[in-house]
């Protein structure tokens, strides 16, 4: 009897995910976390890139009153693993994005592959890559925000921890806040698992109401790290102006 082998490439691992369940979770609760996709050695290799020169810009969060920590945007070309994950995550998320647009009575504007979407970004003057590494030490945090860099924006994005909560750092939970019209804000506090991708809205998502779907505004941030070093990889699909 033939034996099945585990997917070896990042793209194969992403393709093998239970996308039916993940899409349902995104539709119902607005976020979903995959099982681990990146292996421990891959996470360590990405984290080690933080101190090299492959970045187009560095942001000190305190200086800009974004929180306490540091992040760096990768330069082009992206590291192979980051580029592979970005391209593999995009198609199933584009299906979700188009479904959300239809629920809100809009056209389904997102092409099926990332290259076509990036061409749209570039035509709008958004040519700088946006995947990034983020690092926090004890006391580090990130205030609530949205990752928008121009008129063209993809409705979903992804983040993964590159080290282990409870072992390499404490605190630092991912915080996702939704503001529904004429209602109090609701916070989702999520523990990131190393190598697993949390999928979540960039700016808004549809929620079903008594008169059809309506928009709820989303923002995200990071709770205070109480000990250790927390590192994450963020994958944003639209480029920046």
Predicted regions and their residues:
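Non-heme Fe(II)/2-oxoglutarate
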Residues: 21-118
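A structural signal for short, well-ordered beta-strand segments
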Residues: 131-133, 158-160, 233-237
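Catalytic core of Fe(II)/2-oxoglutarate
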Residues: 154, 165, 169-241
């Amino acid at each position: 009897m033939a034996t099945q082998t585990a997917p070896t490439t990042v793209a194969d691992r992403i393709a093998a995910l239970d996308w039916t369940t993940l899409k349902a979770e995104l539709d119902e609760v607005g976020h979903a976390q995959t099982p681990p996709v990146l292996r421990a050695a891959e996470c360590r290799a990405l984290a080690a890139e933080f101190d090299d020169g492959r970045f187009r810009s560095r942001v000190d969060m305190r200086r800009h009153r974004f929180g306490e920590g540091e992040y760096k945007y990768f330069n082009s070309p992206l590291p192979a693993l980051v580029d592979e994950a970005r391209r593999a995550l995009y198609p199933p998320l584009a299906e979700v994005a188009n479904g959300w647009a239809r629920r809100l009575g809009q056209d389904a504007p997102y092409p099926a592959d990332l290259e076509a979407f990036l061409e749209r970004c570039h035509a709008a003057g958004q040519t700088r890559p946006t995947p990034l590494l983020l690092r926090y030490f004890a006391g580090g945090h990130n205030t609530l925000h949205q990752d928008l860099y121009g008129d063209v924006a993809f409705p979903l994005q992804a983040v993964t921890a590159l080290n282990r909560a409870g072992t390499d750092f404490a605190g630092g939970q991912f915080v996702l806040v939704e503001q529904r019209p004429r209602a109090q804000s609701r916070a989702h506090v999520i523990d990131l698992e190393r190598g697993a991708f949390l999928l979540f809205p960039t700016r808004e998502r549809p929620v079903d109401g008594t008169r059809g779907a309506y928009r709820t505004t989303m923002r995200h941030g990071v709770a205070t790290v109480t000990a250790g070093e927390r590192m994450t990889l963020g994958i944003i699909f639209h480029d920046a102006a």
